[in-house]
Amino acid sequence: MIIQGGMGAGVSNWRLAQAVSKTGQLGVVSGTALDTIFSRRLQLGDPGGHMQRAMGHFPDADMVDRILARYYRPANGSGQRPFKTPPMISLDTDQHTKELTVLANFAEVFLAKEGHENPVGTNLLEKVQLPNLYALYGAMLAGVDYVIMGAGIPREIPGVLDLLATHREVSLKIAVGALNGNRFYATFDPKAFLQKTLPPLKRPIFLSIVSSVLLATMMAKKANGKVDGFVVELPEAGGHNAPPRGKLVLNDLGEPVYGDRDTIELEKIKALGLPFWLAGCWGTPEKLQEAISLGAEGIQIGTALAFSKESGFTDAIKKLTIENIHKGTASVFTDPSASPTGFPFKVLSLEGSLSEDETYQERPRMCDLGYLRHLYEKSDGKVGYRCPAEPASVFVAKGGNADDIQ
């Protein structure tokens, strides 16, 4: 089986996932930032009526009405006013934000599954923890078949899926820069949230994205529930990469150098007895056969599908990138500091985009989305939020490291 990579935000959209799943492979939606994406689709008049069609199948019509009343704008005149941005999600987020996140993920998975009987997955980031309980529940209400997670160690997610499958209350330890070893948790009670007849749910298959035998072993043996398999990502994979093991060394271009310690011994992955897929420059028929010969179930493909007609990239981005590839001028840089997650990140050089330092420096510094804010415990015991996108003076005044905003 080929897994379509989960590329956020909005690149791996429902159209791409549906198209892939209709071929018999695993289409995957990205659950990252779906509350914002969903609300903007509604404010653009919901072209094609797809969001409202999906919402018509949600089990709580009152909840749907509340979201539509707040965000939907008729198509005529849409786009003339600034977008109404949803509230930033927080540790004790309000009911509206929960409803929006659940509905957004429900709609994306519902549409990806529409018109066929094949499985569909959702991809979430461990580094973007705060929305994940609500995102998972929304996806499960729509019948999601696979949950794929990386960008961290999602050790608690298998147990969360077990509980959500029976609408039981769940909690998730949240990474907070805490004083005196204090711990902080996000909680979610589906029964209190929905307060309707609860539909039967299935527990989706959980695949952990790993970059080492050590991490795969930890997930297989120490997760709080069943891990069903792995996506084994090599450093060549697109998007976020695991940092090299040991002291960070950069090459002449400023990219992280991966060494022998970063080589993944596939025989040891295989010995764990769980199915696995290979990712990171495996996207050819020949590499697929090689992966299978090494014991893999198949491969995960991202980049090639990112430039398909169904992906969420704009046509202009697709056209310019493909032209650059044909001219031999396309380049990808593994940037050790581009992502607020702290993980290396693949950056495609594209004229007029934030890949150019001049364009990046001209962008006003503001924190308007907040998905990658750093949580920390304040002296009064409450949780504060540092945002690498906010003005540098504000970030540093909250105790942030100036290097984290470059």
Where are these regions (language model features)?
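Conserved active-site-proximal phosphate/metal-binding subdomains
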Residues: 3, 227, 235-275, 283-286, ...
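Active-site entrance/lid segments in N-terminal catalytic domains of soluble metabolic enzymes
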Residues: 1-271
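Hydrophobic residues within well-ordered alpha-helices
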Residues: 20, 291-292
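Ubiquitous "structural anchor" signal
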Residues: 13-16, 35, 288, 306, ...
